[in-house]
């Protein structure tokens, strides 16, 4: 067991103020959080004891939307319209990445997360196997999100990853998702919708990030991306939409109706 003592503890519970105390950890799970208990502590053989020296201990921050391995593209191209940035400066470089590249780049990003107090993320990228391996090797908590679109991954691969990695315990898990409406043809979206119904699973995706994205979807389908995705049954079990910069009142009603985060 591990003991962290002489700490100021913030639990984030509304009815509990910051207090002086200690934390006991066994088998990677917190067993005790409370006032210092020196009498009981002397009865235990500790693997490690850490004097927090009065510093604050609190739950780690959670980064709800990441593309960890994209750290290699930081400042590669700034101040560009979204679609030009993606098509000209992101997708061509991503196409050259190997699974090993993504493994090591994910570990690099995780090191940066940890230095900022981030202990968990929801990570959408290209190779779930190596992403999950990187997180487990770092002892970092990650939910990998499906990223299928017209040119990478497939509905069958998403289902295989879901069956392999989706679980309620452990450091890592997997959830259904796709990159975005504008990169994913209707046939694939319908396939993901069917998986959601089969597994009673939520779906996660980028949505309404730019005005041009919304306008192009309206031109193609007669609906905004949010309404179009609802029509395809993608929100029957909720989920999450990333960005949502350009949303109509009708879009917001969809979000409320399906309790989408």
Map each language-model feature to its residues:
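Short, glycine/acidic-enriched loop or turn micro-motifs at the edges of active sites
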Residues: 66-68, 126, 209, 246
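Short, surface-exposed connector motifs at secondary-structure boundaries
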Residues: 111-119, 170-175, 232-238, 256-261
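Divalent metal-coordination and catalytic microenvironments
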Residues: 7, 23, 28, 54, ...
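Short beta->alpha connector loops
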Residues: 9, 121-128, 182-183, 244-248
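Alpha-helical scaffold segments that flank or form the walls of functional sites
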Residues: 74-139, 159-168
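Metal-coordinating catalytic core of metallo-dependent amide/deamination hydrolases
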Residues: 130-245
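N-terminal metal-binding scaffold of metallo-dependent hydrolase/deaminase domains
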Residues: 1-43
């Amino acid at each position: 067991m591990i003991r962290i003592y002489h700490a100021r503890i913030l639990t984030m519970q509304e009815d509990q103020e910051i207090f002086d105390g200690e934390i006991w950890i066994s088998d990677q799970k917190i067993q005790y959080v409370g006032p210092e208990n020196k009498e009981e502590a002397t009865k235990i053989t500790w693997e490690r004891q850490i004097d927090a020296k009065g510093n604050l201990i609190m739950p780690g921050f959670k980064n709800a939307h990441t593309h960890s391995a994209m750290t290699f593209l930081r400042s590669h191209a700034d101040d560009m319209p979204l679609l030009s940035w993606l098509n000209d400066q992101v997708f061509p470089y991503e196409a050259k990445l190997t699974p090993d590249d993504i493994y090591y780049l994910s570990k690099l990003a995780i090191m940066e997360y940890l230095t900022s107090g981030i202990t968990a993320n929801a990570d959408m990228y290209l190779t779930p196997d190596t992403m999950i391996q990187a997180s487990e090797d770092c002892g970092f908590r990650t939910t990998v999100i499906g990223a299928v679109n017209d040119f990478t991954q497939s509905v069958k691969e998403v289902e295989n990853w879901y069956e392999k990695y989706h679980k309620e315990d452990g450091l890592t898990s997997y959830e259904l998702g796709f990159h975005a409406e504008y990169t994913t043809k209707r046939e694939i979206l319908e396939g993901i919708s069917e998986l959601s119904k089969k597994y009673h699973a939520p779906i996660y995706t980028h949505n309404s990030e730019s005005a041009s994205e919304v306008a192009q979807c309206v031109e193609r389908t007669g609906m905004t991306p949010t309404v179009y995705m609802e029509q395809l049954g993608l929100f029957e079990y909720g989920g999450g939409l990333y960005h949502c910069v350009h949303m109509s009142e009708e879009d917001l009603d969809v979000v409320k109706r399906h309790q989408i985060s």
